Structure formats: C-alpha cells, structure tokens
C-alpha cells in the first residue's frame, strides 16, 4: 500500500517493530530495578525486625551483590536512618521506619504493576507486527516459488 492510501510501508513496519523491541527491553530493565527495590525494602524490614527482637549482632552485606558479609555487633536498636526519597533521609524509631518502608513498597509495587500493564500492551503490539511481517515474508516466498 502506498502512504497516500492510509497504509504504511514495509520499512515503516520494520522500524516500528525495532522501536517496540527496544521499548520492551527498556521496560523489562526498569521492571527488574523495581523488583530489586521491593526485595531491598523487604530485606530492610527483616533487619528492623531482627533489631526489634533485641538481637545486638547482625550479618550485613558489604556489597550490593552479596559477595561479602560482615558481622556487625553493638547495634543500638531503637532508631534507624531511613531513605525518604530523592536525597532525604530521616532518623526515626523502628515502627515508623517500617511504616515508611511499607508505604514506599506500596508505591513501588503500584509502579511495577503499571509498568507491567504497559509491557503487556507493548509486547502484544510487537507480536502483532511480527505476525504481519511473517505473513508478508511467507507471501513473498510463495510468489517467488510460483515464478
């Protein structure tokens, strides 16, 4: 079909598929980051519960991937410093920290769900375009065999 008839060219269809593939990859990376944030919040809450139980020692990851642990002793378990967002932190009691972390987890979970919905829409559109491209390729192959 020509552009004047309201259709799109094969090159435009291929470009749209390429764009959607990159968009899907970006959404998947963001989704992974959100899930890692949720896991970090859960770990922080577990640490607070350990502190609330009166345990004065804790194993702490030194790096983000967990290659190195250190035993930390002498923990005073009545206050922690919690990240509020952007570059803001606050020293709060343990129960307040859990409330802040729960709220943050809810926000991130909502964002992850919204992102997942967008990812499903993009994947569906991408799959439709790939199906169309496959049909075009099969039709071209049949025409070539008929010649």
UniProtKB/Swiss-Prot annotation:
Pfam families to which the protein is assigned, alphabetical: Prefoldin (PF02996)
Keyword terms of this UniProt record: Chaperone, Cytoplasm
An individual GO BP term: protein folding
InterPro entries with a match to the protein in the record: PFD_alpha_archaea, Prefoldin, Prefoldin_subunit_alpha
GO MF: unfolded protein binding
Domain of life: Archaea
Major location (coarse): cytoplasm
Annotated compartments: Cytoplasm
CDD domains: Prefoldin_alpha
One GO CC term, this protein: prefoldin complex
Subunit structure of this chain's protein: Heterohexamer of two alpha and four beta subunits.
Family as reported in the entry's similarity comment: Belongs to the prefoldin subunit alpha family.
HAMAP family recorded: PfdA
Function: Molecular chaperone capable of stabilizing a range of proteins. Seems to fulfill an ATP-independent, HSP70-like function in archaeal de novo protein folding.
Name this polypeptide is given: Prefoldin subunit alpha
Organism per entry: Saccharolobus solfataricus (strain ATCC 35092 / DSM 1617 / JCM 11322 / P2)
GN (gene name): pfdA
